[in-house]
């Protein structure tokens, strides 16, 4: 049986003959015109009879076989690919930054496919980052409104309390005890309401901050050196895969 393969442009697919002896595989005869994709035509024959012809794109096949990140689907041009878990094939390689971002967003420490537990270090994010972006839109509005109210009510309550106490002292000097007691009671009620509102708001936002801090930690992946797949090795694997697929024989 004889198998031959030629590469041409999609507009022209002439016959490709081979003078190789029976049982041998003819090497590829390929050409790339104007940088366009190569189309491979595989012809299989036995004892002079045509068995099958297959046309496929060579460049697409070789591109799909190259290692890429399973999250962003990019190669190792910008960042080296890692193989930190027990996943194999196209799901076995991933960028370090992509994995750290996914572990931080999902608040997990294991692979969702093979359930391999990663070795990670979690560091809490600073308070300033939470103040800039506390979470959902309604939490942003609540935080902004409470901060404005606190900045406005605090000096107002302080001045009102001071004026009430000053008036109570003046009424005591003029023997007006009833008015003095009323002003003192008003001052106590004013500060009680102010402190109650401040404590409730502060406790509410502390709970939101603790929840945000727990679910939005900075994740640092700790990977042994043996798990790191260098970019040169990735390129070599892609080249071997390219050659292996180019020499397939379809009968």
Curated annotation (Swiss-Prot):
Catalytic activity of the protein: S-ubiquitinyl-[E2 ubiquitin-conjugating enzyme]-L-cysteine + [acceptor protein]-L-lysine = [E2 ubiquitin-conjugating enzyme]-L-cysteine + N(6)-ubiquitinyl-[acceptor protein]-L-lysine
Keyword field contains ATP-binding: no
Gene3D superfamilies xrefs: Zinc/RING finger domain, C3HC4 (zinc finger) (3.30.40.10)
Record: residues binding Zn(2+) 1: 69, 72, 95, 98
GO BP: any one term: endocytosis
Main location as per UniProt: membrane
InterPro entries (UniProt xref): Znf_RING, Znf_RING-CH, Znf_RING/FYVE/PHD
Organism domain of life: Eukaryota
Membrane spanning stretches: 143-163, 180-200
GO cellular component: early endosome membrane; endosome; lysosome
Zinc finger annotations (RING-CH-type) as residue ranges: 61-121
Annotated membrane topology: Multi-pass membrane protein
Transport among keywords: no
Entries under SUPFAM superfamilies matching the protein: RING/U-box
Pathway the protein takes part in: Protein modification; protein ubiquitination
Molecular function GO terms recorded: transferase activity; zinc ion binding
Keyword terms of this UniProt record: Cytoplasmic vesicle, Endocytosis, Endosome, Membrane, Metal-binding, Transferase, Transmembrane, Transmembrane helix, Ubl conjugation pathway, Zinc, Zinc-finger
Subcellular compartments: Cytoplasmic vesicle membrane; Early endosome membrane
EC number: 2.3.2.27
Residues engaged in binding Zn(2+) 2: 85, 87, 111, 114
Domains: entry comment: The RING-CH-type zinc finger domain is required for E3 ligase activity.
Function of the protein: E3 ubiquitin-protein ligase which may be involved in endosomal trafficking. E3 ubiquitin ligases accept ubiquitin from an E2 ubiquitin-conjugating enzyme in the form of a thioester and then directly transfer the ubiquitin to targeted substrates.
PANTHER family the UniProt entry points to: E3 UBIQUITIN-PROTEIN LIGASE MARCH 2/3 FAMILY MEMBER (PTHR46065), E3 UBIQUITIN-PROTEIN LIGASE MARCHF3 (PTHR46065:SF2)
UniProt name for this protein: E3 ubiquitin-protein ligase MARCHF3
Organism of origin: Xenopus tropicalis
């Amino acid at each position: 049986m004889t198998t031959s393969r030629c590469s041409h442009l999609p507009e022209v697919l002439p016959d490709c003959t081979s003078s190789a002896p029976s049982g041998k595989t003819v090497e590829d005869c390929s050409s790339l015109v104007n940088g366009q994709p190569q189309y491979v035509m595989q012809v299989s024959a036995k004892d002079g009879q045509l068995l099958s012809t297959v046309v496929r794109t060579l460049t697409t096949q070789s591109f799909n076989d190259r290692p890429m990140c399973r999250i962003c689907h990019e190669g190792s041009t910008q960042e080296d690919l890692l193989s930190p878990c027990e996943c194999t094939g196209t799901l076995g390689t991933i960028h370090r930054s992509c994995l750290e971002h996914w572990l931080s967003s999902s608040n997990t420490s294991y692979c969702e496919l093979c359930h391999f537990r990663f070795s990670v270090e979690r560091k809490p994010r600073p308070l300033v980052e939470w103040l800039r972006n506390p979470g959902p839109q309604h939490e942003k509005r609540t935080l902004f409104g409470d901060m404005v109210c606190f900045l406005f009510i605090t000096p107002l309550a302080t001045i009102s309390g001071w004026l009430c106490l000053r008036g109570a002292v003046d009424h005591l000097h003029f023997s007006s005890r009833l008015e003095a007691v009323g002003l003192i009671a008003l001052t106590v009620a004013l500060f009680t309401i102010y402190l109650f509102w401040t404590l409730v708001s502060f406790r509410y936002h502390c709970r939101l901050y603790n929840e945000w801090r727990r679910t939005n930690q900075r994740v640092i992946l700790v990977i042994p050196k043996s798990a790191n797949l260098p970019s040169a090795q990735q390129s070599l694997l892609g080249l071997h895969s390219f050659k292996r697929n180019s020499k397939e024989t379809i009968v």
